């Protein structure tokens, strides 16, 4: 493509699309030279944008590589490590969900790293959706499990929290040699298990588990919002926002509400 014959606005759109797609076939050094040699100031500045993009991508690869290396130090080459995390411990409605993910930790080429992984709460909805698909495609194995609000009411959130993590690990298609869980150890787990404080920001495997668990649960709550629109589950995901609590007081609870969590809100239970 001859950038010199393009309008500045078209060049800007072209560069934007390249950076979004992270096209591996692009010779970025040649592209930067072409932009910097252009007589138009706006086009020259796009060269700076590409340089900044490459610098940020390098930093991101280093950050994520460190997350992979964090996991690798726990196991020997050729063995499996699973990262496990849960989402939905605190909401007033909906299930608690956990995921376990086994990654290929022997990746040599940085191009194959799953970039942008992190604590799922620090990632936008759109990026989480995109990453969830990538994680599922590239994972050696993954498992997503849920425990309903009814079972939470019956057995308590502490038991369910541990149980859903245990189920996620036990339903993997490969047998991990070690499980890393976020925050605390999984009790009564037959597989060797260690916990990592703030693990979803340190461990690649835990971060990936955090992301796919949250995406699964968020999409489930969005579907529930179609059945129960008064509660705005598509916005609060079942958490106790002011609007959600007001809706409970006005309309009562649904089948997916955790009645054991509502004793201080309603006097019905």
Swiss-Prot record:
Q: Which reaction does it catalyse?
A: Endonucleolytic cleavage to 5'-phosphomonoester
**Class of enzymatic activity (EC top level):** hydrolase
EC number(s): the record gives: 3.1.26.4
Cellular location of this protein?
A: Cytoplasm
Q: What GO biological process terms are annotated to this protein in UniProt? A: DNA replication, removal of RNA primer; mismatch repair
Extract one GO molecular function annotation from the record: manganese ion binding
List keywords of the entry alphabetically.
Cytoplasm, Endonuclease, Hydrolase, Manganese, Metal-binding, Nuclease
Cellular component (GO) terms are: cytoplasm; ribonuclease H2 complex
- Family, per the entry? Belongs to the RNase HII family.
Q: Which cofactor does it need?
A: Mn(2+); Mg(2+)
Q: What does this protein do?
A: Endonuclease that specifically degrades the RNA of RNA-DNA hybrids.
Q: Which InterPro entries match?
A: RNase_HII, RNase_HII/HIII, RNase_HII/HIII_dom, RNaseH-like_sf, RNaseH_sf
Name of this chain's protein: Ribonuclease HII
Lineage at the top is: Bacteria, Bacillati, Bacillota, Clostridia, Eubacteriales
- Cofactor-binding details, from the entry: Manganese or magnesium. Binds 1 divalent metal ion per monomer in the absence of substrate. May bind a second metal ion after substrate binding.
Which CDD domains does the protein's record reference? RNase_HII_bacteria_HII_like
What residue stretches are annotated with the RNase H type-2 domain? Answer: 79-269
Q: Where does a divalent metal cation bind?
A: 85-86, 182
Q: What is this protein's gene name?
A: rnhB
């Amino acid at each position: 493509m001859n950038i010199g014959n393009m309008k500045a606005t078209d060049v800007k759109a072209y560069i934007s699309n390249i950076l979004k797609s992270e096209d591996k076939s692009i010779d970025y050094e040649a592209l930067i030279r072409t932009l910097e040699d252009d007589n138009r100031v706006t086009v020259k500045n796009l060269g700076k944008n590409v340089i900044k993009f490459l610098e940020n991508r390098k930093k991101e690869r280093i950050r994520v590589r460190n997350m992979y290396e964090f996991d690798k130090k726990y196991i020997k080459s050729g063995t499996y490590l699973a990262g496990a995390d849960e989402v939905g411990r605190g909401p007033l409605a909906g299930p608690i969900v956990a995921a376990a993910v086994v990654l290929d930790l022997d990746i040599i080429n940085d191009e194959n790293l799953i970039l942008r992984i992190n604590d799922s709460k620090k990632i936008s909805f759109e990026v989480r959706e995109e990453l969830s698909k990538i994680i599922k495609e590239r994972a050696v194995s993954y498992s997503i499990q849920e425990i309903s609000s009814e079972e939470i009411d019956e057995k308590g959130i502490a038991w369910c929290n541990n149980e859903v993590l245990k189920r996620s690990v036990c339903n993997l298609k490969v047998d991990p040699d070690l499980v890393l869980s976020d925050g605390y150890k999984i009790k009564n787990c037959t597989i060797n298990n260690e916990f990592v404080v703030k693990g979803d920001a340190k461990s690649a495997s835990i971060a990936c588990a955090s992301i796919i668990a949250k995406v699964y649960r968020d999409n489930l709550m969005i579907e529930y919002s179609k059945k129960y629109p008064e509660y705005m589950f598509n916005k609060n995901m079942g958490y106790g926002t002011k609007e959600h609590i007001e809706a409970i007081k006005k309309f009562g609870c649904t089948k997916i509400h955790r009645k054991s969590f509502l004793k201080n809100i309603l006097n019905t239970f």
